[in-house]
Amino acid sequence: MSLRRCIAFIVCVVCAASFNACQEQSWESAMAAGQAAVQQGNYVEAERIYLAAVKKAEEFGREDPRVAVSLSHLAQVYAGQGKHVEAEPVYLQALKIYQAVHGENHPDVAATLNNLGVLHRMYGQYEQAEPLLTRALAIKEKLLGPHHVDVALGLANLAQLKVSQGQPEKAEPLYRRALAIREESLGPSHPEVAKTLEHLANVLRKLGRQDEALTLDLQAREIRAKRS
């Protein structure tokens, strides 16, 4: 290779790297702006920003992980606005990319399955929700172990589905596992512990165990009182 060609090649490589860095910065800025809009409760603006972020991410390739990240955030914004019809295919598109990039057993796959399951549960589509939430929980347990705080979230979501299905007896052991994990991982005075106690109390009331439910409600109130 001649000196001139060598210099030209180096210049091309440097320019490409600079261009990619600018693309990356542009995408990251869009994602940050979208998150800020969500935190402000401006879902219409967040939707617009995340749609633009998807297009920016696609410049890296249609199956680039950044596309899946952008799609996941967009789907969450759709869901936050009650746009189930719009959210589901976007989640599915993100899931397809995550599975292609990472395989079946990956935290991003589990998170997307979980979000899809919660979406279906919210709209009363319990038969579709259950296998998604069950699969998400299984992946988390395999990757993180049975006592990780993210496993508690999966257990709680599955328990909530069982309550919605009119099966409080199946929800109780799931909530108890979630409670034990959260108490151990987050401490006995954490707000998530209080929330789990309240959900478990609700289940016990449905099972006719009023005294036990009252005890848990009082524990939850004590936690919230200490933090107020």
Question: What is each of the regions a protein language model found here?
Answer:
Residues 23-24:
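Bacterial signal peptide processing site
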Residues 176, 198, 202-226:
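TPR/TPR-like (Sel1-like) alpha-helical repeat modules
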Residues 8-18:
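Bacterial N-terminal signal peptides
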Residues 59-62, 100-104, 142-146, 184-188, ...:
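Short coil/turn linkers that connect adjacent helices within long alpha-helical scaffolds
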Residues 28-41, 65-80, 91, 107-122, ...:
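Conserved alpha-helical positions within TPR/SEL1-like repeat arrays
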